[in-house]
Swiss-Prot record:
<feature type="modified residue" description="Phosphoserine">
    <location>
        <position position="419"/>
    </location>
</feature>
<dbReference type="GO" id="GO:0030318">
    <property type="term" value="P:melanocyte differentiation"/>
</dbReference>
<dbReference type="GO" id="GO:0043123">
    <property type="term" value="P:positive regulation of canonical NF-kappaB signal transduction"/>
</dbReference>
<dbReference type="GO" id="GO:0097402">
    <property type="term" value="P:neuroblast migration"/>
</dbReference>
<dbReference type="GO" id="GO:0017046">
    <property type="term" value="F:peptide hormone binding"/>
</dbReference>
<feature type="topological domain" description="Extracellular">
    <location>
        <begin position="27"/>
        <end position="101"/>
    </location>
</feature>
<dbReference type="GO" id="GO:0048066">
    <property type="term" value="P:developmental pigmentation"/>
</dbReference>
<dbReference type="GO" id="GO:0043066">
    <property type="term" value="P:negative regulation of apoptotic process"/>
</dbReference>
<dbReference type="GO" id="GO:0048265">
    <property type="term" value="P:response to pain"/>
</dbReference>
<dbReference type="GO" id="GO:0005886">
    <property type="term" value="C:plasma membrane"/>
</dbReference>
<dbReference type="InterPro" id="IPR000499">
    <property type="entry name" value="Endthln_rcpt"/>
</dbReference>
<feature type="signal peptide">
    <location>
        <begin position="1"/>
        <end position="26"/>
    </location>
</feature>
<dbReference type="GO" id="GO:0061028">
    <property type="term" value="P:establishment of endothelial barrier"/>
</dbReference>
<keyword id="KW-0325">Glycoprotein</keyword>
<dbReference type="GO" id="GO:0086100">
    <property type="term" value="P:endothelin receptor signaling pathway"/>
</dbReference>
<keyword id="KW-0449">Lipoprotein</keyword>
<dbReference type="GO" id="GO:0070588">
    <property type="term" value="P:calcium ion transmembrane transport"/>
</dbReference>
Length: 442
């Protein structure tokens, strides 16, 4: 009988071979390269991988040689575009090397496999083990579910767009995919914010013994996280559309944020989208973590003497959870920084009147796809970070992935009982400590 490790190894090899075949198939189909989207509409230069933070920056096309306006069709119907002035043509084409495409495809497949296995295992651990169903772990489960949505939707679409570029999935999927992508990153960001706040609340009420089960406030937090994430993703579903144009005599269909929005709000959203994504989906979790971890540190220093005497073991567990949450936020910042950096650079450095602007766009397009891979890596690296930082999650992953005969509950039952006894003894000792202080002070 084959071991699980050998079966997983063979499955991984088969997936890598399939990825290589996908790369060759995408090149042989004759679709335009990834940079072709930049010349769409004749009046726009766009990077359009529909990622969690996919963006569109309006400007005049660098690849159009004609001064006549391009004909754009929406949903198969022709729509006239008013004549506009065009900047000088680029001195070179925007291109991505085939080597980068193959490397990107292999990395995406690896991230896809690791992310599916890691986040599914994490959700299974929290679902199967009652002792793991507490407030912080339920928020981590919400984070893992958001990451799983991102992996399933985002990585295959981005890989296909890099290799084939044409959008064959129809207008409905064109609106649904960016909506799900933006909702998933909203779940990730707000879950990290809630975890940071939860760690401060745990330290501020440090004498409270952590129980098993989901607190009502945590359940309310999770509902709010998902509702707010879905609401903030609605403009993506409204703004994205199928855009069809001619590219070197061939029809090219692309799913992108429509440059000609119908309402004033959507026009404002299109203009301010990059800064909105950077501020809310990147800076907000970092700022909240910095504020509440600073407050938590001050609280721990203020109560240091009593905590060391009475609740030493309890304090160690809460410090471990706080360290785990901080590690998750740090990984999030490192993984998402390249993607936001590439788009902020385009906003600040791009000059449509510069004939050398396409060299900058070639560099930013590669940096954009590197950032997309790094953002996807964040979705698969969270379970790995939990494995490395948290002893409890490490034991859970070993028990679940290695299929040990002894279940996690059996291995942890004695530890849980001992921990509860220690907590009760510490509570009793702390009460005596407070009583002695009260009588001595009186």
């Amino acid at each position: 009988m084959q071991s699980p490790a050998s079966r997983c190894g063979r499955a991984l090899v088969a997936l890598l071979l399939a990825c290589g075949f996908l790369g060759v198939w995408g090149e042989k189909r004759g679709f335009p390269p990834a940079q072709a989207t930049l010349s769409l509409l004749g009046t726009k230069e766009v990077m359009t991988p529909p990622t969690k933070t996919s963006w569109t920056r309006g400007s005049n096309s660098s690849l159009m040689r004609s001064s006549a306006p391009a004909e754009v069709t929406k949903g198969g119907r022709g729509a006239g575009v008013p004549p506009r002035s065009f900047p000088p043509p680029c001195q070179r084409n925007i291109e991505i090397s085939k080597t980068f495409k193959y490397i990107n495809t292999i990395v995406s497949c690896l991230v896809f496999v690791l992310g599916i296995i890691g986040n599914s295992t994490l959700l299974r651990i929290i679902y199967k083990n009652k002792c793991m169903r507490n407030g912080p772990n339920i928020l981590i489960a919400s984070l893992a579910l958001g990451d799983l949505l991102h992996i399933i939707i985002d990585i295959p679409i981005n890989t296909y767009k890099l290799l084939a570029e044409d959008w064959p999935f129809g207008a409905e999927m064109c609106k649904l995919v960016p909506f799900i992508q933006k909702a998933s990153v909203g779940i990730t960001v707000l879950s990290l914010c809630a975890l940071s706040i939860d760690r401060y609340r745990a330290v501020a009420s440090w004498s409270r013994i952590k129980g098993i089960g989901v607190p009502k406030w945590t359940a309310v937090e999770i509902v709010l996280i998902w509702v707010v994430s879905v609401v903030l993703a609605v403009p993506e579903a409204i703004g994205f559309d199928m855009i069809t144009s001619d590219y070197k005599g061939k029809p090219l269909r692309v799913c992108m944020l429509n440059p000609f929005q119908k309402t004033a709000f959507m026009q404002f959203y299109k203009t301010a989208k990059d800064w909105w994504l950077f501020s809310f989906y990147f800076c907000l979790p970092l700022a909240i973590t910095a504020v509440f971890y600073t407050l938590m540190t001050c609280e721990m220093l203020r109560k240091k003497s009593g905590m060391q005497i009475a609740l030493n073991d309890h304090l160690k567990q809460r410090r471990e959870v706080a360290k785990t949450v901080f590690c998750l936020v740090l990984v999030f910042a490192l993984c998402w920084l390249p993607l936001h950096l590439s788009r902020i650079l385009k906003l600040t450095l791009y000059d449509q009147s510069n004939p050398h602007r396409c060299e900058l766009l070639s560099f930013l397009l590669v940096l954009d796809y590197i950032g997309i891979n790094m953002a996807s890596l964040n979705s698969c690296i969270n379970p790995i970070a939990l494995y490395l930082v948290s002893k409890r999650f490490k034991n859970c992953f070993k028990s679940c992935l290695c299929c040990w005969c002894q279940t996690f509950e059996e291995k942890q039952s004695l530890e849980e009982k001992q921990s509860c006894l220690k907590f009760k003894a510490n509570d009793h000792g702390y009460d005596n400590f407070r009583s002695s202080n009260k009588y001595s002070s009186s």
